[in-house]
Amino acid sequence: MANQREGRASGELIESRSIDYIPDAERHGSLASQFTLWLSANLQITAIVTGALAVVLGGDVFWSLVALLLGQLIGGAVMALHGAQGPQLGLPQMISSRVQFGVYGATIPLVLVCLMYIGFSASGSVLAGAAVAQLLGVDEVAGIALFAICIVVLTILGYRTIHLIGRVGSVIGVIAFLFMFARLFSNHDLGALLANRHFSIASFLLSMSLSASWQIAFGPYVADYSRYLPRGTSSARTFLAVGLGSVMGAQAAMVFGVFAAALAGSRFAHHEVAFIVGLGSSGAVAALLYFSIAFGKLTVTTLNAYGSFMSMATIVSGFRGQRAISHRRRLVYILAMVTVSTALAIAGRHSFLKEFTAFILFLLAFFTPWSAINLVDYYCFTRSRYDVPALSDPAGRYGRWNRTAIAVYVIGILVQMPFISTSFYTGALVDRLGGTDISWILGLLVPALLYYACACASSRRIPERLILPGEAARAGE
């Protein structure tokens, strides 16, 4: 009877699971769906804008393209390593962070995760709202509000629906980008752009930071969308499906942004939606481009809303000792997260590009140390040998606060501060490096090495296997 009930749950229209463990009987999905989800999430206008920044902020076309690709590969590898944990653990990404930080301690990066995804949702809603407004003939505020309603509905429906829109969005995105590339490249001498090379280490590393931060920013929730895959799914294949989808999608969009900024200049900057739609040769094509822009933002903004509600639920459940949340509480979290991001989008819609640039680069300082700690602990020490019931027990194996991990995390943030270069904060050593921002590199390497050394010296008890809810035995005790 239990298996029948679980089997029915896996086929429900509205997802019944949230922060709790996904039993084997409810596992489903394919690696192809992972690829299309992350391809769709990256074939969108915000990635175009991010790529354009490489040129807008001083880089040439050739070296910007090289740097963006290198950053994609590094950041994409980090992101995909997180994604590969999903099928093995059957848990949301940030719940599993309690293994490293403690049941209460995981709240520290979680609060920042919530802020990040609310910010991403807000910035994406500005661009999507502009497209919806033009498509339906309403003002931008109404366009943002209508887009938010769609996000609420899709987030409530949950995992299956998110993967469905990912599959649809990948098809729409590929068709739209093929058309946009063809229109952009017609009647232009690309060879001249690529031949004009002026290498600058500062611009090169800035471009790398843009694409690496773009990919790493997915890390705190990427496993949320692979956790339903069967437990026997190959980690290597999951890594490739997630990583290739994300890197290919983001690089294609950022390449378009680089060329658009180089060819169109001021006609593109601050007028991104209008420029893209202007590539259409007729009213019908323009309408389809508006639709593709809005739908392109639909996938990733739903991911952000789903991830932010899961993060909020994880924060609250940690202090309440809950292993799951009710449908009513789930709805409250979703409405709260989307309402806040929508209000921010409406309030800040006239200063999007400048604020977004500083936002994405500065947040990287807070997530690279978390990524480093989580990945080193999982791949070097615990693998999938987690005590799932203890993740909700402050008095259990993982405790309330893991002071070692928290200290390494704080050090990982502090070591970056002298090297951060954004519009609202510039580190003391940035000028000595010619304006080069190398903070994210230190934010990965220093915490990884420090946590590895601390974990080797630790006497903590690691289970001999994955301990599931309902099991009385505790391996390793």
PLM segments and residue spans:
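Membrane-interface "cap" regions at the ends of multi-pass membrane proteins
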Residues: 1-61, 203-209, 227-237, 458-477
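Hydrophobic, membrane-embedded alpha-helices of multi-pass small-molecule transporters
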Residues: 31-48, 181-187, 197-260, 283-305, ...
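Transmembrane helix-loop boundary segments of multi-pass membrane transporters
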Residues: 55-66, 130-143, 160-169, 275-281, ...
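Helix-loop-helix connectors at the membrane interface of multi-pass transporters/channels
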Residues: 94-98, 125-142, 230, 304-335, ...
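Transmembrane alpha-helical segments of multi-pass small-molecule transport proteins
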Residues: 110-114, 135-157, 171-182, 211-222, ...
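Hydrophobic alpha-helical segments and their helix-loop junctions in multi-pass secondary transporters
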Residues: 138, 171-197, 211-216, 256-263, ...
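Loop-to-transmembrane helix boundary motifs in multi-pass membrane proteins
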Residues: 266, 315-350, 397-416
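C-terminal membrane-solvent junction of multi-pass transporters and transport-like membrane proteins
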Residues: 370-449, 464-466
